[in-house]
């Protein structure tokens, strides 16, 4: 069903057998029973808006749009493009959405590893803004992820991954960021979901 509003989508999603559709690249690999498929594609949530202080990314934005966005590329010194360019292929990244990638909290997710290193928040329809590092620890519920917000904190960041083949899932992924608040390191593909390490004692 194509939702006419977020309110309608939220109400429909309260059924246990309902499912919010993203790019459907991972959903089709599962075997869950879905009686109500909720399509958010008509709600204008597929854009990236850049302001002086942040990037606001709609949940339906394809990964390919993040990869090609010049503002994100410049801000992360190419790290976000590096984190995305190995994900399967261009056609796949044209379908897969950033919202689906973050909501899934997948252990193999390059996207989650990258965004955890930045000052990132998610906007939930009912839950409001939540820090991404807190969101990944939350149990999955029937809320809807609406947007991802990346604050433009001055930083230096680098992303690296090890793969057995070019377009395979990463064996290990790592994103390290340096800012005036210190060093933040994120390790992904462990195979558990990405792990954030804050250098609270200034050892790094």
Predicted regions and their residues:
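C-terminal structural segment of proteins
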Residues: 1-204
């Amino acid at each position: 069903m194509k939702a006419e509003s977020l309110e309608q989508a939220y109400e429909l999603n309260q059924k246990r057998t309902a499912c919010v559709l993203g790019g459907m690249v991972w959903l089709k690999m599962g075997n869950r029973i879905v009686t109500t498929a909720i399509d958010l594609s008509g709600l204008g949530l597929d854009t990236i808006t850049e302001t002086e202080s942040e990037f606001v990314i709609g949940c339906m934005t394809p990964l390919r749009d993040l990869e090609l966005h010049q503002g994100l590329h410049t801000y992360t010194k190419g790290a976000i493009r590096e984190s995305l360019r190995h994900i399967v292929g261009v056609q796949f990244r044209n379908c897969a959405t950033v919202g689906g990638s973050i909501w899934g909290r997948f252990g193999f997710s390059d996207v989650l590893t990258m965004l955890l290193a930045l000052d990132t928040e998610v906007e939930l329809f009912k839950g409001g803004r939540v820090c991404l590092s807190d969101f990944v620890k939350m149990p999955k519920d029937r809320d809807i992820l609406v947007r991802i917000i990346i604050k433009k904190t001055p930083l230096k960041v680098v992303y690296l991954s090890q793969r057995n083949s070019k377009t395979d899932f990463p064996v290990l992924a790592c994103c390290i960021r340096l800012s005036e608040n210190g060093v933040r390191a994120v390790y992904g593909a462990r195979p558990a979901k990405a792990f954030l390490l804050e250098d609270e004692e200034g050892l790094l």
